[in-house]
Amino acid sequence: EAVVPDLLDFFAATIYEQDFKHTHLGKGWTASASAKLGIPALQRMRRPAIEALKASKRFDPPMAINHVAELAKPFLSIGNQYGEGWFLAGEMAELITSGTPNIVCIQPFACLPNHVVGKGVIKELRHRYPGSNIVAIDYDPGASEVNQLNRIKLMLSTANKNLAKQNAPEQKDQAAG
């Protein structure tokens, strides 16, 4: 089943970064104020959807942006803000910790964050979360479609092998019992 991160989290990350810019990068006090007021305002706006997702049996609510930032901090500084920066690492850690270890990190147009941040933190994510299965794929005019599809198939093959390993002890217990 495909799990797609929440689009509003991208905007929340942009707002969240403003306090760091004020504290560490010399941006004016209005940047910090926009973060301190903007994040709670966005949370209030999202509250009905989050409550509905909490009540659902099939969907999970999005993680609070400050929690996503905490998940990213072992990998990158919040000061890493170009492109998606720290947020890309935080999103991948969020997916893994919430039970989605198989990730296809897709970036269009040879996007610099995927090359620098995405591919750079994938090794450390795999180290910290041993069951994770992550592949980074670029979709741009120069990319080979066959290569893209083969990388996705390889990721799915690894996911199926990992699932079989997880189910093997359960099947063994059922056969013994």
Residue ranges and their predicted role:
Residues 1-177:
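An N-terminal assembly and electron-transfer interface module characteristic of large anaerobic redox
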